[in-house]
Curated annotation (Swiss-Prot):
It comes from Penicillium cyclopium. One of its GO terms (molecular function) is monoacylglycerol lipase activity. Its EC number is 3.1.1.-. Its main location: secreted. Residues 1-18 form the signal peptide. Optimum temperature is 35 degrees Celsius. Belongs to the AB hydrolase superfamily. Lipase family. Class 3 subfamily. Glycans are attached at N251. The activity is inhibited by Hg(2+) and Fe(3+), but not significantly affected by EDTA or the other metal ions such as Na(+), K(+), Li(+), Mg(2+), Zn(2+), Ca(2+), Mn(2+), Cu(2+) and Fe(2+). This is Secreted mono- and diacylglycerol lipase A. It is found in: Secreted. One of its GO terms (cellular component) is extracellular region.
Length: 305
């Protein structure tokens, strides 16, 4: 199905779903919060050209000061990728000896507002599971860099056999990270952890249920961020569960009580229930514990529609 965002937007208001998500009555723990705040800094680092075009052995750094904990680990780049495909997928593989982790990070888009304004959403069969359909652009972004990344991961993991694999991303990078983690779990990395901040929906209900069943998924939304509301439910797209919904305002420190844990692939208790996606709500999109995209260069000018 191929529909533009604005053509389909009005359809969502009339939707009804029989299987709403369940809002858990617990706060996250302090140790969980520490993990959430830490891994997003790897996503933040992926926006810096110096990191996604780094030389092997270079330390990750964030000149805008939004990844201090990552800098403190001394994590080094073992592989990076950028501008190598028509999808402009960018990111890096880093080794964090302090936390015994191999990190695969995907950069978000430099022009996400234009992506929202102009987006068309087409399903494709990724071959991950029976009945599973993924969004074509997100799947293509992963598929075009997959072989090289898997080759590099094999070498890095062989050198660090007891390290965990962590896949991270923000915004469109989170969508690619979600599909990458899903695919990698079936290719020798079954325990790969996913930290997806502000991810759009990546596929249909069958794919969402498949990814959810794999486990080790941490998907974050923030107040009324419009990007996780896309592609629309009316277009056949469903989220991975659970959702960690951050309710604190922009530019504010997040406490354990500010994060609500919501189970279910279709839920109106969290971000989805805050209304239709609006282009005026983008401040919520860039603040996930830190200003995640502070390191990005100039993107395309915002297109008024």
């Amino acid at each position: 199905m191929r529909l533009s965002f604005f053509t389909a937007l009005s359809a969502v208001a009339s939707l009804g779903y029989a299987l709403p998500g369940k809002l858990q009555s617990r706060d996250v723990s302090t140790s969980e919060l520490d993990q959430f705040e830490f891994w997003v800094q790897y996503a933040a680092a992926s926006y810096y050209e110096a990191d996604y075009t780094a030389q092997v052995g270079d330390k990750l750094s964030c000149s805008k000061g939004n990844c201090p904990e990552v800098e403190a680990t001394g994590a080094t780049v073992s592989y990076d990728f950028s501008d190598s495909t028509i999808t402009d997928t960018a990111g890096y593989i880093a080794v964090d000896h302090t936390n015994s982790a191999v990190v695969l990070a995907f950069r978000g888009s430099y022009s996400v507002r234009n992506w929202v304004a102009d987006a068309t959403f087409v399903h494709t069969n990724p071959g991950l599971c029976d009945g599973c359909l993924a969004e074509l652009g997100f799947w293509s972004s992963w598929k075009l860099v997959r072989d090289d990344i898997i080759k590099e991961l094999k070498e890095v993991v062989a050198q660090n056999p007891n390290y965990e694999l962590v896949v991270v991303g923000h915004s469109l990078g989170a969508a690619v990270a979600t599909l990458a983690a899903t695919d990698l779990r079936g290719k020798g990395y079954p325990s790969a952890k996913l930290y997806a901040y502000a991810s759009p929906r990546v596929g249909n209900a069958a794919l969402a249920k498949y990814i959810t069943a794999q486990g080790n998924n941490f998907r974050f939304t923030h107040t009324n961020d419009p990007v996780p509301k896309l592609p629309l439910l009316s277009m056949g797209y469903v989220h991975v569960s659970p959702e960690y919904w951050i309710t604190s305002p922009n530019n504010a420190t997040v406490s354990t009580s500010d994060i609500k844990v919501i189970d279910g692939d279709v839920s109106f208790d969290g971000n989805t229930g805050t209304g239709l996606p609006l282009l005026t709500d983008f401040e919520a999109h860039i603040w996930y514990f830190v200003q995640v995209d502070a390191g990005k260069g100039p993107g395309l000018p915002f297109k008024r529609v």
